[in-house]
């Protein structure tokens, strides 16, 4: 775990957790963008301009597909973690739902779950470290020398 940029991994995990409810929308928008782009910039434009826009279109489509694949991979990981916590640890599951999906403040979470802010911080670290370890095992984070 030393070879991975810890802070960057945690930030990435929190990014996907906070935007989990919007991931399907993001995937569909990227797919629509790729489809619309293909129809509006077809072969006719390439023939008229006599340039390498066809290559640019192909590169852009590949980049969009890579982004969609990456988002789906993170979505799948989060789904698996949620299912794991839902069956094994209801407290962590509820905490994730309240903090990241409903975006409640620590005070509201304290009222609902009877957890102090320190306990919430500790629970956050445990959850994020668990997700980080799973993401590392699945090669979802890039290796960096520390």
Name each model-derived stretch.
Residues 1-86, 139-146:
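N-terminal interaction/assembly modules
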């Amino acid at each position: 775990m030393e070879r991975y940029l810890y802070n960057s991994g945690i930030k990435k995990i929190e990014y996907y957790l906070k935007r989990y409810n919007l991931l399907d929308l993001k995937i569909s928008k990227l797919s629509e963008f790729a489809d619309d782009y293909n129809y509006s910039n077809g072969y006719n434009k390439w023939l008229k301009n006599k340039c390498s826009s066809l290559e640019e279109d192909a590169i852009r489509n590949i980049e969009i597909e890579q982004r969609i694949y990456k988002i789906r991979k993170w979505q799948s990981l989060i789904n698996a973690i949620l299912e794991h916590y839902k069956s094994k640890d209801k407290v962590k599951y509820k905490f994730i739902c309240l903090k990241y999906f409903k975006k409640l403040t620590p005070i509201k979470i304290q009222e609902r779950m009877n957890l102090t802010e320190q306990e919430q911080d500790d629970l956050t670290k445990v959850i994020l470290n668990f997700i980080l370890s799973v993401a590392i095992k699945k090669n979802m984070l890039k290796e960096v020398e520390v």
